[in-house]
Amino acid sequence: MLRVLDEVTILKRMLLLLVILFSGIFAFSQPFPTCDVRAYGAKGDGVTLDTVAVSQAIAACVKQGGGTVYFGPGRYVIGTVELYSHIHLYLDSGAVLAGSHNIADYLPSPPFGFARHYGVDVTGEGALLGMLIAKNADDVSIDGTGEINGEDAAFMAEKSAHDSKDYDERFVRNPEKYQAAMNELEYGPIEPQGRPGTMIVFFHCSNVKLHGIRLASAPNWTVHMQNVEGAAISDIEIFNDPRVPNNDGIDCMQCQHVRITNSNIHAGDDGLAIVRSEDVNVSNCSISSRSAAIRLESTRRSTFTGLSMDTNRGIAVFGDDFPGQQNRPTEDVTFSDIVIRTHLIPGGWWGKAEPIYIAVQPCAAEVVCGVRVRNVVFNNITAEAEGGALLLGAKGAPLTGVELNDVRLHMIVPDPAISESVGGNLDLRWTALTPRDGVVKSDIPALLAEDVNGLRLRNVQVDWADGMPDYFSDGIRVENFKDLLIDSYSGRQAQPDRGAAIDLRHGAGVSITNSRAMPGTRTFLQLDQVQDRRVFVNYDLRSAASVITPATQRFETEIGVPAVQRK
């Protein structure tokens, strides 16, 4: 009898435990609530300011531990709205969040502790927020098939050009025409006037998601993530006016573990700007820009794959010092399977149609800065370009371990009027220490590299369209180098009467193998003060009028260069 009672007691206890367990699971699995903004007073009529109603809907979800804030079809005008943990905005088809035209509807940023530029205090437009901000939030998302529109036209003087004057026109080619090109309006940038700050901000957040939505007409940066850990952006479209300055697509600063996939970005300023971040992976995106499609600064362990770009400057990589912060190089970054089309354009945009651009700030006098860019690799890049690629280290801060593998540079003729006004200049702004060095007159090789150690050029092809402007010059030029490898190169110079397929100056340690001179090559290899000439073998130089200039230059291992081809 006691045994039966014990068994009954045990069975009851087991049933009680199961009830408790399933009750917990059921409670845990209850979905977060959905808070329809219209239920909290939002009109969605395109006229009424719905900031308060939207904020109340968010607050109602927050009280229940989080939830979905739902926007049905309509045009909801808002100023600044704050998002919190476990809040998910859902914009249904036909729903538009539209930025207020009244600048007073946007909150100041200092109370949030947020400053747009690298943690440095800012004033003016940088001291205002935009439409949405999340601070110290976890698990926050914006999803749906609707649109967030920043109403940029309300904050622009469309008949005034924006010229930052970060150059000295005395040192550019054709100064008068260059200056006139800075004031034209067709390509922008146009002048902003009293605009709000970044449209969407995630500041010190984690587990951020953007999916499906359309972001349009940002008057300033579009999406800014700062100190974010874990972000997934997928299947979104950003469509901004290409004339508006600073309307970057997505900016990541001091972020980790970011994924950006299957998205289209159309911006005036940088498409993607990644600064002091780590483990950023971008794939299967289309980017257009009047500035750089991708801008990278002091970022490491990141990949960019399967991209197409239609832009002024293609891929821009910088290694910089930030005031008061420990220098951190850009390193261990790979760009693969990318198609780039660059355009030379007038206006105050940074860039001169470079498909690939790497630069570091010069060191102060008598100071060795150390490596600022290293182990940056480009694989399978096809570029149709109106300007040359630049790889520019600095004295005391050489680029180290940069590789170009399977890269084709097809150089094409820019618009003649634009070429005459702004072509034939190197654009060194951002890394230049003075306006004197910002934009400078120069001939333009298809690929120019300076102050580089361990540069590897494998299967690089250079070809030129007929009738290139006379400022275009060599196929490849490398200056101030150590340990250079050129393998399986094919190319020639731009002009029939001057330049070389390869021009090497002031370096030590070079091997050239398996390479080919293209028809029309004047001089295949031109050398000036190059030491430790190691290997020059396995080539097809039948199309070169001259193989090596000057004739006295020889390699340690050199096979079959006819004397008649030394000049």
Model-derived regions: residue spans:
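Positively charged n-region of N-terminal signal peptides that target proteins for export
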Residues: 2-3, 7-14
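Intrinsic disorder/low-complexity segments in short proteins, especially the signal peptide
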Residues: 7-10, 22-23, 375
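Bacterial N-terminal signal peptides
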Residues: 14-27
